[in-house]
Amino acid sequence: MKVILLKDVKSLGKKGDLVNASDGYARNYLIPKKLAEQATENNVHILNNKKEAERRQKLKELEEAQKLAKSLMGKEIKFKVKIGENGRLFGSITSKDISEKLKEQYNMDIDKKKIVAETIRQTGVYEAEIKIYPEVSTKVKVSVLEE
């Protein structure tokens, strides 16, 4: 019997897969426990529509991420901070600070978890990588200047 999985089933497949299961297993276990539904023509059509909608949504998100990466490319974030001895900062500049500065300077709201940068403790020019989407990332310059 062909069934559409509603949840991940260890021995059969992942949610949304169209699989062949024995009649007894499907009727007595999968369908009553709402792990699967019978693969009727209508259900298969609905499944295909859902998969197509998900594919379009992912494509749209990828395009938006690429636009954001393009707009961030070549941007420079400037920090003016108080300096102690030997050009060292009081404290440090982290990905959270970079995220806040991006919001302040360019009005771009980027989560701090998406910013990969070493902890900055001295003046100079550094590079921070921003991973916008799994396949899309860009780099921005971080300038730390004396106040």
UniProtKB/Swiss-Prot annotation:
SUPFAM superfamilies named in the record: L9 N-domain-like, Ribosomal protein L9 C-domain
Keyword Transmembrane helix: no
Listed GO biological process terms: translation
Cellular-component GO terms for this entry: ribonucleoprotein complex; ribosome
Any Pfam family: Ribosomal_L9_C
Keyword entries, A-Z: Ribonucleoprotein, Ribosomal protein, RNA-binding, rRNA-binding
The keyword NADP belongs to this UniProt entry's keyword annotation: no
InterPro entries referenced in this protein's UniProt entry, alphabetically: Ribosomal_bL9, Ribosomal_bL9/RNase_H1_N, Ribosomal_bL9_bac/chp, Ribosomal_bL9_C, Ribosomal_bL9_C_sf, Ribosomal_bL9_N, Ribosomal_bL9_N_sf
Gene Ontology molecular function: rRNA binding; structural constituent of ribosome
PROSITE patterns on file: RIBOSOMAL_L9
Domain of life: Bacteria
Family: Belongs to the bacterial ribosomal protein bL9 family.
Entry function: Binds to the 23S rRNA.
The protein's name: Large ribosomal subunit protein bL9
Species classification: Bacteria, Bacillati, Bacillota, Clostridia, Eubacteriales
